[in-house]
Amino acid sequence: MKSFNELVGKLSDPASRQALKSMQRGIEREALRIEKSGHLALDKHPKALGSALTHSRITTDYSESLLEFITPVFADIDELVEDLTLTHAYSVRHLNGQRLWPVSMPCYLGDGADIPIADYGSSNSGQMKSLYRKGLTYRYGAQMQIISGVHFNFSVSDKLWHRLYELSDKSLSLDDFISDSYFGLIRNYRRLVWVLPYLFGASPALCSTFIQDPKTSNFPFEVIGDGTLFMPYATSLRMSDLGYTNQEQDNLNISYNSLTDYLTGMQAAINMPSANFAKIGVKVDGEYRQLNDNILQIENEFYSPIRAKRVAKGSEKPSESLARAGVEYIEVRALDVNPYSAVGIEKSQIRFLDLFLLNCLLQPSAPSDATEEAEIAENLQAVVLEGRKPGLLLKRSGQELSLTHWLESLFGNLKQIAQLLDDEGQDDYQVALAKWHKAVENPNETLSGKIMAGLKDEQVDHSEWVMELAEQYHQQLKAYPLTENVDKRYQQDAVESLEKQAYLESQPSVSFDQFLVDYFKV
């Protein structure tokens, strides 16, 4: 494979630069509904937002209280953020006085018993979605499931694939080359995944209510104000063992070395029984507790900071879609909600992600082994827990390397890509890169650094600060202009989604027991 510098040189002609620029992106942003008191909203998904089962833009994640806003695919960043903003603006007008929680970590009082699991109605597919979430509750507790994040979907253009294929040795078919290259991107992303919590991690602190007993926690928390726990150099507690973790999955060792390896590993994981989860029971006294007692109930339960994806046809499982036609796009899952944006992510982050992911694609990407996977996990944990610590050392190929030195080297590569993406008289990518470059030498310029500086300077509780932001963004989004046509379109989408759910529920169907048997047939 050609070196990074060789590839960048080959892509510097006008046609190649245009192909490079034609990226497609989509965003999924999760946000809890909260009452004005700051407590979690416990009511049903608002009817004005349509059916969470069938609406294409507004749904729920784990809980009835956890909204998820989904954009279509856009090639233009301004249009992407505008669409996300309009969906937020419409939604906040229909929350009956509730607000959206603008950070990843919830401030929740309780044992999780009252957190309402998302309800998708009485159709078999709706019941299955709810039961999957019930299984997550039994397995990991409800509290972990109401942590929110932002997912970034990304693909490059067919034109770029044809250009890169021309520059390859053509030992694979074009389709196989595309999947192989996406897996190369994924491996490089995993090697560098720590960069995202370093820059964009926004959960260095949380409400003490999230930890049942801070004194018995393994984390060396310090306290600000009345009830805010923090770690001095943490970047993303959401990405730590406090957040999304699953020790059962630690031994799955699913390989990203090829699509075939990945699908083989996923198939094995789906069918691997768990002694721990068997103790819960699948159907107890006539009532389901989980879909099955395997390590993964379904593929979606597999936690990874990046996923290979393809749009499913009909009732295809994710791996069936990939097996049918290969990788279509990737989903970045390592982003905290950005509290400095009303919609959880800002344009400079999107431009950085474009550069970061293109770098992961264009760099050579050797297969990964168990030793490197251990390094990857170690580096990520080091950065989420103490990424802003002066002189922090990470590991690369068995050698220690300072985080700052590694970042400087990376930013040098990103600058070359930014120069290809910016047209004459336009410097959006270079400006975004310069903005985040400030955080390389000065950790206070990271999102987590800014948050901690603000909490310490003002000596406010995390929850108080977040409530102020929630109110500010509520007013901002409520005032955001919605034309009559746009408002009508959202109303129509809501009505049509409810009709679609009602239609699904009116159709003759097999029993739910039989539906599950059919779904899990190998």
Curated annotation (Swiss-Prot):
Pathway participation: Sulfur metabolism; glutathione biosynthesis; glutathione from L-cysteine and L-glutamate: step 1/2
A GO molecular-function annotation: ATP binding
Reactions performed catalytically: L-cysteine + L-glutamate + ATP = gamma-L-glutamyl-L-cysteine + ADP + phosphate + H(+)
Domain of life: Bacteria
GO cellular component: cytosol
Leading EC class: ligase
SUPFAM superfamilies listed in its UniProt record: Glutamine synthetase/guanido kinase (SSF55931)
Keywords (A to Z) from UniProt: ATP-binding, Glutathione biosynthesis, Ligase, Nucleotide-binding
Catalytic activity, EC: 6.3.2.2
Transmembrane intervals: none
Family statement: Belongs to the glutamate--cysteine ligase type 1 family. Type 1 subfamily.
Record protein name field: Glutamate--cysteine ligase
Organism of derivation: Shewanella pealeana (strain ATCC 700345 / ANG-SQ1)
